Every structure is written in structure tokens, then in C-alpha cells.
């Protein structure tokens, strides 16, 4: 059985003549350990889909089966537990708490998970060993995003969801963040899903899903993913 199964998922906003189909009969499967890129233009429906996968939103209809459990049937309380225990989130904007140090920001997230990783080890793994006691305002943008990734990883989630994680970063820093995510996926066998409008990064993925007009336009596996260092855009 696939780790993620999305079956006939639609997300519809509005009613009557004023209806928006953000997702329209979406279907795909993701195997355990895959690094998946969901790519599409702005407004294609990819962030809506990511929110549904992360339990931050629910589909109007359809099934979202993750690790053999259909979260589309979950109550709000069950979805809160799912997000807390199983999912890590990385967004374009870092959402760090300004009056906590980098280390404290990550520690705060790790405290909500019963199976969290050693925070100092995670900080070292993301290249922030010497920035533990710095506040967010003292960090560069790429460093702040590394804190956000460490915060997500420290929970030891089965699923790491990343919505335009390099959108606010320069080219060089963005590549370093993508390498960090690729290394995390391949070293831990965890599932990482990256939502992006940048189709040039598709070669780094094990699995590529293209979204347009709320529908899956293409769904393919990549038998030979490239290291991020070999990709240019």
C-alpha cells in the first residue's frame, strides 16, 4: 500500500453560481520515502492540496489516506493530533518567534512531540551549530529558514510539507535549502513534499506531480533524481 493515497479529492469554495474549485478530482499515490515535488503556477491549487495533506484543511469530497488512515474522516481534534505528531511544516515565511533564540524556537516545537529528536543535533545537522543563541533578527534569511526547517525536523515527523520554501531566498541560499531537504529525505526515508512554481527544480525529486486548474496534469516517477548541486535555474 502507498504511504499517501489521494482519491477523487475536490475542494470547493462558495455556493450557487459563485463556486471555485481549488482542487477538482485529484488522484495520486506517493510511496514511503519519496521526495515529491508538486509544481504549478500561482492559483493552480497546489497550496490548497498541501493544506489538505497537512490536516490544516479538509476536502469537500474524496479520501486522503496517509499511512493507512483516512484523515478526510477525522474530526478537528483528530486533525490537531495528526498535525502535532505526524507532520512538519516549512513555509516561504519563517514564522519564528522573535524574542526566542534559534535554539529556543526549535526546542518549543520539539516539546509537542513525544518522539522528538535531540534539538542540538538537529541544529548542527542544518548548519547552525554556531548560531544557537542568536535571535531571529540576528540571522540572515537563509539561516532563519534553516531554523524553520530544524523546527519541523525536530518533531521527527513522518511527513515534511514545504510550501515554496525558497520563495523569499536568493538563488545560492535557495539551493542550499533544497539540498538540505533532499538530504533529509534520502538519509531518513521520510516523505518530503515540496510545493513550488519553479519547474526547474523537478529533476531533484523522486516523484513529480504537475497541477493546473485544480487538477493533476502530469504524474511521473523520476528513476534518476539529480543532486541539487547539479541543477541550474
Give, region by region, the residue ranges found by the protein language model.
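Conserved beta-strand-loop-alpha-helix hinge in the C-terminal portion
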Residues: 215-233
